[in-house]
């Protein structure tokens, strides 16, 4: 394949080039019109800006595919409103041709709600239909009595709120959809991701998803739209080791085993992220907590590393981040900390010194700005501190944590650079990234000979957009979030094209 009349992102000369792709690699880059085209598919991008394809370094892909079909609770500003939204959904479901046995809503953010979540509130409006509402951070749910009964949940009869490891177990039952259905939803989500310039994902689905991806690629019959690294969780570590799995092992074309993932603490919205200092605005001294004893976390990380797995460790609170960094340092481990939302001032330099990457989700800062200003108001300058990580030399990679935030790298990039959306004033702009940094942290390759044939063509130049609109960050944020992608090529195969 030859991508002709391409303007490389950041090329000051502005000269168009032909990019020759062969066997999944960039074979040559020559002046536009000079490539030998006979026998090649030629794609004319008409002087559009071309850059490397984008990666989302942290997704839960099946959950995201399902989330796209669930009741949207993002705008619910109270428990009562969320219950009313679900009541409407129950009514619509009952009148449908094939009603779902469980009605699921997703995306509520209750950190600042004034009223309490109770089964009584939900039961009064949803009746005998099992209803489950999933929080925006996917660390808890709120269920009515019918749902508690259906899934055999013990306790929680007053509030219907289930959190952390108990919720993670329940979520697997909710995600138990037949293979044909879920594979169709996943493929739809993959095509949509490709339309936003995504060429690869790190899939941290909370089950052993390797067999699922092998099946999907085999049934697709062509190069799947995404390159996938699929993770492994503690519950499946022994099985994965027994099966000979290790990070980097190819399972199918474009599918490899990804990292070992462990969730060490909770989240900010549920006030379960483990902190050095107590949460503000919470009765008593509440610090959050680890999901596992420290010695168990250490033992699992050492065992996974010994078995050949890369390490990806969820840590949100500053105490959890300190603990994980201590474990890495003590055992000479390397890997990534996922989220790193709150970090002690003295721990920023440890990321670079210990060779620990920060896998961060910039849109969470925009989602959680108001909650942060309540519960972490006395430490907000250390929250979602991307600039501090970069200035201390940390390797930073960007992702969405979909379904927590949408799987769209342009939303991620916009949040990283502008620290705002919906016209609000930027939040702690001093912790933002430059547009060049955000783009670099969203890619794994460059437009050079010998690099992977992963590239995208854009209908606008993101560097120019930010330069032109930089004085109005709200407009710059909107422009980046909506930036059109004309062409996506992953491993030398076209996975999306529009008007080219």
What is each residue range found by the language model?
Residues 469-500:
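P-loop/Walker A phosphate-binding loop and immediately adjacent motor/lid segment at beta-alpha junctions
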Residues 22, 45, 448, 490-491:
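Structural motif
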Residues 20, 262, 488:
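Short aromatic-centered micro-motifs
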Residues 47, 144, 197, 257, ...:
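Conserved, mostly hydrophobic/aromatic
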Residues 46, 146-156, 238-259, 343-355:
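Short amphipathic alpha-helices and their capping/turn segments at secondary-structure boundaries
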Residues 60, 254-272, 356-365:
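Non-cysteine beta-strand/loop elements that form the S-adenosyl-L-methionine
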Residues 2-5, 12-243, 269-303, 307-320, ...:
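Divalent metal-binding segments
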Residues 184, 301-312, 316-335, 339-340, ...:
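His/Asp/Glu-enriched, well-ordered alpha-helical/loop segment
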């Amino acid at each position: 394949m030859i991508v002709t009349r391409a303007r490389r992102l950041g090329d000051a000369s502005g000269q168009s080039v032909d990019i020759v792709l062969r066997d999944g690699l960039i074979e040559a880059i020559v002046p536009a019109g000079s490539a030998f085209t006979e026998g090649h598919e030629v794609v004319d991008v008409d002087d559009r800006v071309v850059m490397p394809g984008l990666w989302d370094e942290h997704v839960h892909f099946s959950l995201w595919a399902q989330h796209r079909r669930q009741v949207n609770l993002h705008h619910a500003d109270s428990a009562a409103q969320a219950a009313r939204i679900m009541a409407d959904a129950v009514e619509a479901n009952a009148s449908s041709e094939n009603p779902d046995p469980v009605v699921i809503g997703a995306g509520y953010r209750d950190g600042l709600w004034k009223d309490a979540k109770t089964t009584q509130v939900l039961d009064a409006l949803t009746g005998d239909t099992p209803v489950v509402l999933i929080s925006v951070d996917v660390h808890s749910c709120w269920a009515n009595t019918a749902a508690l009964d259906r899934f055999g949940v013990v306790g929680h009869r007053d509030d219907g709120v289930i959190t952390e490891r108990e919720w993670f177990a329940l979520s697997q039952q909710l995600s138990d959809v037949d293979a044909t259905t879920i594979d169709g939803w996943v493929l739809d989500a993959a095509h949509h991701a490709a339309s936003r310039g995504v060429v690869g994902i790190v899939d941290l689905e909370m089950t052993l998803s390797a067999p699922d991806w092998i099946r999907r690629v085999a049934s697709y019959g062509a190069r799947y739209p995404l390159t996938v690294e699929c993770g492994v969780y503690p519950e499946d570590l022994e099985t994965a080791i027994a099966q000979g799995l290790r990070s980097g092992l190819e399972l199918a074309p474009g599918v490899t085993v990804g990292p070992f993932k462990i969730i060490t603490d909770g989240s900010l919205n549920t006030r379960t992220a483990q902190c050095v200092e107590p949460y503000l605005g919470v009765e008593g001294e509440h610090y959050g907590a680890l999901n596992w004893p420290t010695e168990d976390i250490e033992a699992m990380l050492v065992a996974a590393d010994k078995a050949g797995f890369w390490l990806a460790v969820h840590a949100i609170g500053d105490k959890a981040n300190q603990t994980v960094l201590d474990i890495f340092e003590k055992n000479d481990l390397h890997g990534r900390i996922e989220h790193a939302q709150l970090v002690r001032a003295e721990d920023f330099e440890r990321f670079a010194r210990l060779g620990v990457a920060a896998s961060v989700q910039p849109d969470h800062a925009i989602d959680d700005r108001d909650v942060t200003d309540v519960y972490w108001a006395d430490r907000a300058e250390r929250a979602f501190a991307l600039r501090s990580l970069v200035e201390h030399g940390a390797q930073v990679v960007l992702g969405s944590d979909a379904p927590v935030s949408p799987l769209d790298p342009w939303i991620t990039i916009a949040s990283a650079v502008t620290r705002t959306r919906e016209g609000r004033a930027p939040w702690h702009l001093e912790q933002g990234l430059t547009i060049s940094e955000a783009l670099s942290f969203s890619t794994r390759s460059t437009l050079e000979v010998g690099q992977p044939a992963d590239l995208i063509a854009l209908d606008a130049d993101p560097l120019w957009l930010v330069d032109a609109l930089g004085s109005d960050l709200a407009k710059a944020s909107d422009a980046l979030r909506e930036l059109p992608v004309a062409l996506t090529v992953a491993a030398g195969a076209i996975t999306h094209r529009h008007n080219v």
